Amino acid sequence: NPSLTIEQFGTTGFGILDIKAIIHPVTIVEDYVNDKNDDKEITDKTRVIDDTAFNSVIKNEDNSEYKALSNYFINQTITDKNDYTGMFKDKNLIVIMMESANDIFINPEYYPNFYKLYTEGWSWENNYSPRNSCATMNNEFSGMTSLYSIYNTCTASKYKANTYYESIFNLFNRQNYVTFSSHDYTEAYYPRSTIHKNMGSGEYYGVQKLGIKYSNEYINWANDDEFMEAVLKIIDKKTSNNEHFMTWLTTVSSHQPYSSSSIQGDKYY
């Protein structure tokens, strides 16, 4: 949250970093290769939606611009299938959103595990992270709903009371999966326990409910290693009868301030 950062640390630190970047610019070399060309069966993408209501809107619309937009959208392909449909049927899903991370992690020397995941797994470049206030929660919101966040507000906070029928949680709920979500920090910034519930998460686990150590200061964030260990226990408990599950986990250890000492950061510095 840039606004909160300025309030807590002032503008001096950011100014110094900007000056440093001008005098000593850093060149980022992307040395990773992702040239996987999987042969996929062509999927039938015939439009599968009842357009009765949409046609009625178009028929009764007097504004020519709105009508043109509606005609554009109604002629787009809408299907519940794509090239990956059914590939992971009946599999469990763990989504890990890393707070404050970027593609610097895709480095075989310093981060071999991330590099392996990126180059040997699937990766997509057509993804854009909003660089605005509330960046973390706006990205989380987009990932959970496939909706763009609003650039000038914290979308998840402003619309936390809405019900999101097509969220990732509800998609899995309709398939009788056990769903839950978790973040290893408090709700001092974002109302996750409220919006996650309205998105269909079966249960939300904050840092207190996880029972792991944390600090109210920026100095020492909760330990993501302990976070993952706590989550594994939750999974074991919730799937004692071999139920399928889906969970969304948002980490915290790599959060700013990046120039300050921290327990997790010092382990690898």
Positions of PLM-derived features:
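N-terminal secretory/membrane-targeting segments
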Residues: 1-91, 107-111, 118-119, 126, ...
